[in-house]
From Swiss-Prot:
The modification Phosphotyrosine is found at residue 38. Keywords: Capsid protein, Helical capsid protein, Host cytoplasm, Host-virus interaction, Inhibition of host innate immune response by virus, Inhibition of host interferon signaling pathway by virus, Inhibition of host MAVS by virus, Inhibition of host MDA5 by virus, Inhibition of host NF-kappa-B by virus, Inhibition of host PKR by virus, Inhibition of host RLR pathway by virus, Interferon antiviral system evasion, Phosphoprotein, Ribonucleoprotein, RNA-binding, Viral immunoevasion, Viral nucleoprotein, Virion. Its main location: virion. Tyrosine phosphorylation modulates viral transcription and replication. Changing residue 69 to F: Increased transcription and 50% loss of replication. Homomultimerizes to form the nucleocapsid. Binds to viral genomic RNA. Interacts (via N-terminus) with the phosphoprotein P (via C-terminus); the phosphorylated phosphoprotein P binds to N-RNA complex. When in a monomeric RNA-free form, interacts with the phosphoprotein (via N-terminus). Interacts with protein M2-1; this interaction allows the association of nucleocapsid with the matrix protein. Interacts with host EIF2AK2/PKR; this interaction inhibits EIF2AK2 phosphorylation of EIF2S1 and blocks EIF2AK2-mediated translation shutoff. One of its GO terms (molecular function) is RNA binding. Residues 31-252, 244-290, 338-364 are annotated as: Interaction with the phosphoprotein. It is found in: Virion; Host cytoplasm. InterPro entries: Pneumo_ncap. This is Nucleoprotein. GO terms for cellular component: helical viral capsid; host cell cytoplasm; ribonucleoprotein complex; viral capsid; viral nucleocapsid. Pfam families: Pneumo_ncap.
Amino acid sequence: MALSKVKLNDTLNKDQLLSSSKYTIQRSTGDSIDTPNYDVQKHINKLCGMLLITEDANHKFTGLIGMLYAMSRLGREDTIKILRDAGYHVKANGVDVTTHRQDINGKEMKFEVLTLASLTTEIQINIEIESRKSYKKMLKEMGEVAPEYRHDSPDCGMIILCIAALVITKLAAGDRSGLTAVIRRANNVLKNEMKRYKGLLPKDIANSFYEVFEKHPHFIDVFVHFGIAQSSTRGGSRVEGIFAGLFMNAYGAGQVMLRWGVLAKSVKNIMLGHASVQAEMEQVVEVYEYAQKLGGEAGFYHILNNPKASLLSLTQFPHFSSVVLGNAAGLGIMGEYRGTPRNQDLYDAAKAYAEQLKENGVINYSVLDLTAEELEAIKHQLNPKDNDVEL
């Protein structure tokens, strides 16, 4: 069966049906949600730093703290607006810094803690106590701790959010199958930061963000808007530059993702990649625009459940063979496919076409200007013969 015979769903009718709705729904964010403002940003950044300097840190709450930091950069008002625009009923909890005194080994100690509904005073104090142990050890080893190794370095919060930027691109897979790729990428782009901080453990931090995004989907909307706002703001630190690169690459600015689907288990890459880079593909763009109107995870899962959209009209591409093979690989057609294909005709057509292109040597790897990392990912995905691949 030819790809050209596979028909799209009638998205226009669906769109008209949804547009005609006179009602909206309200989702709940839970009992209350902490909405920190700019004034506590420095303290939350320091909390992130305490986790980073702690050797073998427990990162159970790092995802949550990272999101609190992102919200403090957006500000309380914008955070609430983002949530309300996404259909959430928000009972906002203001966040302040207070002083807490506690007896530690017979000695009264003073701690500054945040008035959070989501993170108890006890947890915050434990994070600080553990970080103090590591800091004492650093003082013994280094004599004096340089500013970039300290817990109050201004980029601590953004270092943690770089891992969130990697995690968010993998959510549409519906599982944590992208964790290995997140760890590998984090080890590469944050290698300098890992030399600074012994508590920067990509696997543990990534799992913490997975947990937060899975349990609290409203944070996904907040993070996407934060990422766009952060990336569109000029200037900033080196780590802010890294974050913008990771975030914008993940959201479709990188054509390698579009062509190869190496990271296509995140449907968000395909969706925004096609819509922004290949606007001439009217049928595909129609579906993607429709999915964007659905918004949030609903739109991404719509595309996940309709993989045919990303495999149609591909003959219009200058390097259409590469794109077909890339999308086929990304959808699991050339790699591992989990579960039963939702559209057997599409699956068979795409698989046959992609295999034919591969066998006939139609794909010209050398014109794609791949980095060593991308080449490694493609080798892993497609297992080409060594002489097929040139850099």
